[in-house]
Every structure is written in C-alpha cells, then in structure tokens.
C-alpha cells in the first residue's frame, strides 16, 4: 500500500515568484488594454 503514498510524497510545496516572464507578458498586454477600453468608453460620452 506504500505505492498510493508515493505520489503524495513527491509533491513538494513551492513558493512561486510573483514577477515572472508570464507576469510581465500578461501585464504588458493587460494594462494598456484596460486603459484603451476606458478611453474608448469615455469617448462615447463626448457627443
């Protein structure tokens, strides 16, 4: 029955870094996107 315990022993708890390449890529796209969506939404009221 030690075979069922083996996968649980292999899992080790990691503290993942916040600033990763994925984080930079996501925010480099997300922040301007939210800004432009807000700007486009604001333009709708400039009539």
Curated annotation (Swiss-Prot):
With its partner (PsbE) binds heme. PSII binds additional chlorophylls, carotenoids and specific lipids. Heme binds at residue 27. The chain crosses the membrane at residues 23-39. Keywords: Electron transport, Heme, Iron, Membrane, Metal-binding, Photosynthesis, Photosystem II, Thylakoid, Transmembrane, Transmembrane helix, Transport. InterPro entries: PSII_cyt_b559_bsu, PSII_cyt_b559_CS, PSII_cyt_b559_N. It is a single-pass membrane protein. GO terms for molecular function: electron transfer activity; heme binding; iron ion binding. SUPFAM superfamilies: Cytochrome b559 subunits (SSF161045). GO terms for biological process: photosynthetic electron transport chain. PROSITE patterns: CYTOCHROME_B559. The keyword Manganese does not apply. Its main location: membrane. GO terms for cellular component: photosystem II reaction center; plasma membrane-derived thylakoid membrane. Its cofactor is heme b. It is found in: Cellular thylakoid membrane. Belongs to the PsbE/PsbF family. This b-type cytochrome is tightly associated with the reaction center of photosystem II (PSII). PSII is a light-driven water:plastoquinone oxidoreductase that uses light energy to abstract electrons from H(2)O, generating O(2) and a proton gradient subsequently used for ATP formation. It consists of a core antenna complex that captures photons, and an electron transfer chain that converts photonic excitation into a charge separation. Heterodimer of an alpha subunit and a beta subunit. PSII is composed of 1 copy each of membrane proteins PsbA, PsbB, PsbC, PsbD, PsbE, PsbF, PsbH, PsbI, PsbJ, PsbK, PsbL, PsbM, PsbT, PsbX, PsbY, Psb30/Ycf12, peripheral proteins PsbO, CyanoQ (PsbQ), PsbU, PsbV and a large number of cofactors. It forms dimeric complexes. This is Cytochrome b559 subunit beta.
């Amino acid at each position: 029955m030690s075979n069922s315990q083996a996968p649980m022993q292999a899992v080790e708890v990691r503290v993942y870094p916040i600033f990763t390449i994925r984080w930079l890529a996501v925010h480099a796209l997300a922040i301007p996107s939210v800004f432009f969506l807000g700007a486009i939404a604001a333009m709708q009221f400039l009539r």
